[in-house]
Amino acid sequence: MNFDMSKLMQQAQKMQEQMKKAQQERENMEVIGESGAGLVSVTMTGKYDVKKVTIDDSLMSEDKEMLEDLIAAAVNSAVKKVEDSSSSADIGKMAKEAGIDLPNGFNFPFK
């Protein structure tokens, strides 16, 4: 087996650059989480900062507890969208693009 440390370092550097770019893109993105069929929506950045909460006027006459549940569900929906944007499948794709062959079934510990 021919082991080329220089090539491996180049591949690792390329993957690191791709990961940094993906992280910057994630930080700049915004997602919208919804609940109650869109009656409550939350706009969140890739850094998990909530930028906006929108509540349909029809909910203003509803009970407080239901409204709180809908807001929590919308926030959770937005969080899931941010987390899904940086899946281990994306990292595996970056590794492949950098020329790094990962074994089948290899999973990254962060997700």
UniProtKB/Swiss-Prot annotation:
GO molecular function terms listed in the Swiss-Prot or TrEMBL record: DNA binding
Disordered, as annotated region: 1-27
Main location: cytoplasm
Keyword Kinase: no
Biased composition (Basic and acidic residues): 17-27
GO cellular component: bacterial nucleoid; cytosol
Compartments, as annotated in UniProt: Cytoplasm, Nucleoid
Top-level lineage group: Bacteria
Pfam families reported for this sequence: YbaB_DNA_bd (PF02575)
Keywords: Cytoplasm, DNA-binding
Record Gene3D superfamilies: Nucleoid-associated protein YbaB-like domain
SUPFAM superfamilies: YbaB-like
NCBIfam families from the UniProt entry: DNA_YbaB_EbfC
Record function comment: Binds to DNA and alters its conformation. May be involved in regulation of gene expression, nucleoid organization and DNA protection.
Family in the record: Belongs to the YbaB/EbfC family.
Quaternary state and interactors: Homodimer.
Name the UniProt record assigns to this protein: Nucleoid-associated protein Fphi_0115
Organism encoding this protein: Francisella philomiragia subsp. philomiragia (strain ATCC 25017 / CCUG 19701 / FSC 153 / O#319-036)
Taxon lineage: Bacteria, Pseudomonadati, Pseudomonadota, Gammaproteobacteria, Thiotrichales
